């Protein structure tokens, strides 16, 4: 059965005229360092636990078709302290009981259907799709979703899709219909399959995407403006750089001109940020981000401090030492030479999960 899991109590989260592009610089009432506008009331990055929906069988609920659960199919020891779970079983949600006949994906393209494995005339396609759309609205406060691997309702990828022609081989490129419906209604929502979360890099990346999404929701609730969108990016730029230099550059281009388009650009920025953070942050990515942060600080460092930091970053790049060592060296330098811009970087809070 696995360790006990925290199941959350549901609680909600908290067309403009054309204007000149937002230019970063000194503004009355705002502290400024580098290219970051430091506003004292900027929403803080949420601390765990954060609300996350999850396939109910993964929490120990005996809701699978045969009356079993899948509690051991999740690395819960590393997740229980970070997430508050909202368990959902779409099959139970549409009125299928336990035990029940298993369901399967059949067909191709727009004709994809979900039917009973015992009776192909029992079609739950529309019911699962509608349930997904409804849950996307009901679960407005969630900041991520953990789906059951290869499930015809919940799988994100590699789900078996059977041909409606008897004897034809099945494909393994399907997506669960409930998951597809819900995620289409919640673009940007971090989602991952349970089995992939046993990979430490995937697990850490997912945790950070969830926390980032939660931070974004706070920003939206507080009111998205051009200045706040730029400040949000400024705080995440080195974390995004560590994960994907391509997405880092794309995000910068998106924010180069926000005239009267903050809401529209904000949606595109979130998609770019989530896609970028979904890329693995390798040693070279970390070393690149750390080197850029060193470049921001280097004029204040002594020759000895510079040598120590450069050597630590190079050991990170080559794998001779963990990323945390180089990060610690940079934090020591920041303690001796405080810098508001680097001190506001999300990278330092995120790297503990990577």
Predicted regions and their residues:
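Internal, conserved structured core segments that host functional sites
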Residues: 137-219
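Short beta-strand segments
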Residues: 55-56, 89, 146-150
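Acidic, Ser/Pro/Thr-rich low-complexity regulatory regions
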Residues: 190-354
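Glycine-rich anion/phosphate-binding loops
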Residues: 120-139
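Short N-terminal binding/cap micro-motifs at the start of the first secondary-structure element
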Residues: 59-67
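Short catalytic helix/loop segments, enriched in acidic residues and glycine
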Residues: 68-85
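Short, surface-exposed acidic-centric catalytic microdomains
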Residues: 87-111
């Amino acid at each position: 059965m696995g360790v006990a899991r925290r199941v959350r109590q549901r609680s909600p989260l908290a067309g403009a005229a054309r204007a000149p592009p937002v230019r970063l610089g000194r503004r009355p009432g705002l502290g400024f360092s580098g290219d970051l506008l430091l506003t004292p009331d900027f929403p803080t990055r949420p601390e765990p636990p954060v609300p996350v929906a999850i396939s109910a069988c993964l929490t120990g609920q005996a809701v699978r078709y045969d009356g079993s659960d899948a509690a051991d199919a999740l690395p819960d020891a590393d997740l229980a302290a970070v997430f508050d779970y909202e368990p959902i079983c779409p099959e139970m949600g549409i009125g299928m009981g336990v035990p029940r006949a298993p369901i399967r994906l059949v067909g191709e393209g727009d004709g994809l259907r979900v039917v009973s494995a015992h009776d192909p005339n029992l079609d739950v396609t529309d019911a699962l799709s509608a349930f997904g759309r409804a849950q996307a609205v009901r679960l407005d406060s969630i900041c991520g979703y953990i789906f059951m691997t290869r499930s015809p309702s919940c799988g994100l990828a590699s789900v078996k899709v059977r041909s409606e022609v008897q004897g034809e081989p099945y494909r393994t490129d399907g997506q669960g219909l409930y998951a597809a419906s819900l995620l289409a209604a919640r673009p940007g929502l971090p989602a991952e399959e349970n089995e992939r979360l046993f990979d430490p890099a995937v697990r850490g990346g997912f945790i950070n995407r969830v926390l980032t999404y939660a931070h974004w929701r706070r920003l939206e609730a507080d009111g998205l403006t051009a200045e706040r969108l730029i400040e949000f990016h400024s705080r995440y730029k080195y974390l995004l750089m560590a994960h994907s230099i391509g997405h880092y550059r794309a995000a910068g281009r998106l924010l180069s001109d926000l005239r009267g388009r903050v809401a529209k650009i904000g949606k595109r920025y979130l998609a770019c940020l989530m896609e970028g953070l979904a890329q693995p942050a390798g040693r070279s990515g970390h070393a690149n981000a750390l080197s850029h942060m060193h470049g921001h600080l280097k004029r204040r460092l002594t020759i000895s401090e510079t040598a120590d930091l450069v050597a630590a970053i190079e050991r990170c790049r080559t794998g001779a030492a963990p990323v945390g060592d180089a990060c610690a060296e940079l934090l020591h330098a920041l303690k001796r030479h405080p810098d508001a811009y680097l001190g506001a970087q999300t990278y330092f809070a995120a790297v503990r999960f990577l």
